[in-house]
């Protein structure tokens, strides 16, 4: 709440040339909120309204005033939608798999990985991210864990975040030496004994059919990741377009419009 009030207050003070939050009038607050309605989600807009509402105390220009709720014009993410699985569905699918495939399913969901990227998982210190890209500092905002990297389409190496407890389980499956595997005509160095590629995808589909009665393929966990991250970022008051850009990079793309494909 304090962060939201600071952000809103600074923007209003700069726009109207006032020096104190106490000078913010109801008209200034309403104007600010209406302007924000086109760029942030409903939860973020409600947070800023509640923050500004704190200024209705004695001694403030907004004393006794109640700010009405304003509806956002920005894109709202309905979760889950399209090909996305819910977290409970992912858990059910993983519970029906053998341990090496179950861990792969959980990691793919937690980090938004493609099936072949599971082969390429490495600690970031051993496989640095591609340096020719400008990576957003907002990646993984609001989440904690251990940074790994994977090699995606076009050879792009990107950072991914894996929850610490999951990373500990992954490290327990580290191979003494990497093995070379071939999948769909491409050779990979694999450093962990976890499921990946076509074999993991087949295991995922079979487990999904047994547990939830349907599947959208393993790529659905990337859709779930994208939708979860958009919801998290918008709830943290990231503007819609900025959230699209952040999630795009987390998925290994650099086009915000690609993220919207995962939201359908």
For each predicted feature, which ranges?
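Basic, Lys/Arg- and aromatic-enriched nucleic-acid-binding interface segment
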Residues: 87-116, 241
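Active-site/catalytic core of tyrosine-dependent DNA strand-transfer enzymes
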Residues: 161-227
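Non-catalytic DNA-binding core/recognition domains of DNA-processing enzymes
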Residues: 1-63
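Catalytic-site neighborhood detector that most strongly recognizes the C-terminal catalytic loop/helix
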Residues: 249-264
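Flexible interdomain linker/hinge and immediately adjacent N-terminus
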Residues: 30, 61-91
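Conserved tyrosine-mediated DNA breakage-rejoining catalytic core shared by Y-recombinases
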Residues: 121-169
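The alpha-helix within a helix-turn-helix
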Residues: 108, 119, 247-249
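Short basic/aromatic active-site micro-motif
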Residues: 201, 213-234, 240-249, 253
């Amino acid at each position: 709440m304090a962060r939201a009030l600071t952000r809103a207050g600074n923007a209003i003070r700069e726009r109207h040339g006032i020096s104190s939050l106490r000078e913010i009038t109801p008209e200034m607050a309403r104007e600010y909120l209406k302007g924000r309605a086109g760029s942030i989600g409903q939860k973020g807009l409600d947070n800023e309204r509640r923050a500004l509402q704190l200024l209705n105390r004695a001694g403030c220009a907004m004393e006794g005033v109640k700010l009405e709720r304003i509806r956002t014009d920005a894109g709202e993410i309905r979760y889950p939608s399209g090909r996305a699985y819910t977290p409970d569905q992912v858990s059910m699918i993983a519970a029906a798999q053998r341990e090496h495939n179950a861990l792969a399913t959980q990691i793919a969901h937690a980090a938004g990985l493609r099936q072949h990227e599971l082969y390429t998982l490495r600690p970031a210190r051993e496989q640095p991210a591609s340096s020719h890209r400008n990576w957003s500092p907002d990646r993984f905002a609001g989440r904690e864990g251990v940074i790994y990297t994977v090699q995606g389409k076009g050879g792009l190496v990107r950072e991914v975040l894996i929850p610490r407890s999951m990373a500990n389980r992954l490290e327990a499956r580290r191979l003494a030496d990497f093995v070379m595997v071939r999948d769909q005509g491409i050779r990979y160095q694999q450093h962990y004994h976890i499921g990946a590629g076509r074999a993991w995808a087949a295991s995922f589909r079979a487990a999904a059919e047994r547990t939830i009665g349907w599947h959208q393929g393993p790529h659905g966990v990337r859709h779930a990741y994208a939708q979860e991250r958009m919801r998290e970022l918008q709830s943290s008051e990231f503007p819609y377009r900025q959230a699209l850009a952040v999630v795009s990079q987390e998925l290994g793309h650099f086009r915000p419009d690609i993220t919207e494909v995962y939201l359908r």
